[in-house]
Amino acid sequence: MASILTNSSALTALQTLASTNKSLESTQNRISTGLRISEASDNASYWSIATSMKSDNKANSAVQDALGLGAGKVDTAYSAINKIRESVDDIKTKLVSAMGASTEDKGKIETEIKSIVANINSALSNANYAGSNLLNGPTTDLNVVASYNRSGNAVAVDKITVKATDTDAKTMVKDIVDAGFFTSASDDTAIGTALNTVETALASLATGAATLGAAKSQIDSQKSFLSGLQDSIEKGVGTLVDADMNKESARLSALQVQQQLGVQALSIANSSNQSILSLFRG
């Protein structure tokens, strides 16, 4: 039925065009942002999950930074304590050479040992990283944040701890660097006592190096694990919220065609009133 009051065809065409325009706007937004779900109204459940995962990954990034800083401190101490251990081992060799040596030769050995002791003191002082020295008389344990775990609303932060007493190389070599440890006047008995002191220091330094080596390995392993975890979480977030650009591009082309057809349909529907007017022309 033709009516001059209500154009049903035009109303239908208008509704179809409005729906197409809305879909087109949504598709254009997905293409411009690269996201299928960019806000809670798109999909509240997926948006909430993705938001929590992104937050966890930010925390993991902070943990990575802490691990990097901790690795620097441990690596520096590990390198230095091994140099100190090698120096003490050199002193051991010098002391063995001093057994039964002449006073003149002992004087030369004394000079060499003093030079090695100076190197030990230098290594102790320079084993510093970001204001932290794990060898030169540390007073507090090193705690490195290693992981961030969330279960519901409960959060747990795990740490890798290096005890100060296990890495205090200054105390380990104290009896060696003290003045008078070895002099050209030392007899074989005194040299034997000095060798016992050296052996004790070497054992302590080996334990300290093992402690730092274990911490170094643990930190490196955790850094690698955390890097993989971050990648997995990022992929998971992408699966939830990222738009498939191939599909969206194809959808955009189809909707643009639908929009053009909708405009034409509306134009045709509006022209129907002109045919009614022609009925009254002479």
From Swiss-Prot:
<dbReference type="Pfam" id="PF00700">
    <property type="entry name" value="Flagellin_C"/>
</dbReference>
<dbReference type="GO" id="GO:0005576">
    <property type="term" value="C:extracellular region"/>
</dbReference>
<dbReference type="Pfam" id="PF00669">
    <property type="entry name" value="Flagellin_N"/>
</dbReference>
<comment type="function">
    <text>Flagellin is the subunit protein which polymerizes to form the filaments of bacterial flagella. The flagellum is required to cause a persistent disease in a murine model of infection.</text>
</comment>
<dbReference type="InterPro" id="IPR001492">
    <property type="entry name" value="Flagellin"/>
</dbReference>
<keyword id="KW-0964">Secreted</keyword>
<dbReference type="GO" id="GO:0005198">
    <property type="term" value="F:structural molecule activity"/>
</dbReference>
<keyword id="KW-0975">Bacterial flagellum</keyword>
<protein>
    <recommendedName>
        <fullName>Flagellin</fullName>
    </recommendedName>
</protein>
<dbReference type="InterPro" id="IPR001029">
    <property type="entry name" value="Flagellin_N"/>
</dbReference>
<dbReference type="GO" id="GO:0009288">
    <property type="term" value="C:bacterial-type flagellum"/>
</dbReference>
<dbReference type="InterPro" id="IPR046358">
    <property type="entry name" value="Flagellin_C"/>
</dbReference>
<comment type="similarity">
    <text>Belongs to the bacterial flagellin family.</text>
</comment>
